[in-house]
Regions:
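N-terminal secretory signal peptides that target proteins for export/translocation
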Residues: 1-6
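Bacterial N-terminal signal peptides
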Residues: 11-22
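Catalytic nucleophile loop
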Residues: 129-132, 151-175
């Protein structure tokens, strides 16, 4: 596909989303009276751009989940048959919290994701972590199910949802790189994320894989959306409509009305509602 065709495809997809997918920004049961524009109304998110998860990111996730009292569910669907992603995550969390505080979950289909007994660990958890891999595998099983609603309930009681790589993109309302054919298709056959970030598309590995410009055309065609690209070993910690950058590299923020993206580094804060850097002394 040449660049002009790609741009037209993105523009048409954006218009379709704006006119036909209002539900992209909503939870499984209709959300009304939202107090935030993009971020979660309650609870917090830790959205990681892939690669090695550095200690300061783990520290923030565990602190937000309750410290030594945290109860974590690790959802491994994105990894498919590959053990590397989820084994390393489970090992790290068990080392920090103990094996009894960490529950792996890999539900096989929508039927299982609607089974109250199988999703019970989410209802008791203080934190959820999505491993990397392919984000459509998460959407295909959990979207608009009782498990999905249980994730919203976790946020409502002040919990935290984290994820790396595919586990980052799934947290947006638009599922970026969600095609089953491969991650080079930006908007594909799975378009809806879990929506913890409303009117948002999230990309990952942006500098390592030279993806920092990929969100631009979509955001220009869909001005109500914001695009967030996160590099490896870097995360954003989201509370309401504010996020803080954590880690060793950069975050790119795309929104309508700017010539290019804004780059943020560790410690910098961004107002998602006003779409501007928060100045700190």
């Amino acid at each position: 596909m040449n660049m002009n065709t790609l741009k037209r495809t993105i523009a048409l997809a954006a218009l379709a989303l704006l006119t036909g997918f209002a539900a992209l920004a909503q939870r499984p049961t209709a959300a009304t009276g939202a107090s935030t524009v993009h971020g979660p109304e309650k609870g917090s998110l830790v959205i990681i751009g892939g690669g090695t998860v550095v200690p300061e990111i783990w520290d923030r996730f565990i602190d937000l989940a309750g410290g030594r009292d945290a109860r974590i569910v690790v959802i491994t669907n994105a990894s498919g048959e590959t053990d590397d992603f989820h084994n390393a995550t489970i090992t790290e969390l068990q080392k920090r919290l103990g094996a009894d505080r960490v529950t792996p979950m890999n539900l096989k289909n929508i039927v299982e994701a609607n089974d109250p007994d199988l999703i019970a660990p989410i209802t008791k958890a203080t934190g959820i972590y999505f491993t990397g891999g392919r984000q459509w595998r998460i959407s295909e099983v959990y979207l608009n199910t009782l498990a999905h609603q249980a994730m919203w309930d976790l946020l409502a009681r002040g919990g935290v949802i984290a994820g790396s790589s595919a586990g980052a993109s799934i947290q947006g309302s638009l599922l970026w790189r969600g095609d089953t054919a491969g991650p080079d298709i930006l908007i594909g056959d799975h378009t809806q994320g879990l929506g913890f970030m409303k009117y948002t598309a999230i990309d990952q590995h942006i500098l390592v894989r030279n993806r920092q410009h990929d969100l631009r055309d979509f955001i220009n065609a869909a001005p109500m959306f914001i695009g967030i690209g996160i590099d490896e070993s870097t995360a954003i910690e989201v509370h309401g409509d504010t996020f803080t950058v954590v880690g060793k590299s950069y975050v790119a923020v795309h929104f309508k009305g700017q010539d290019d993206f804004k780059f943020l580094r560790a410690g910098q804060k961004f107002d998602l509602c006003c779409r501007e850097l928060i100045k700190t002394e």
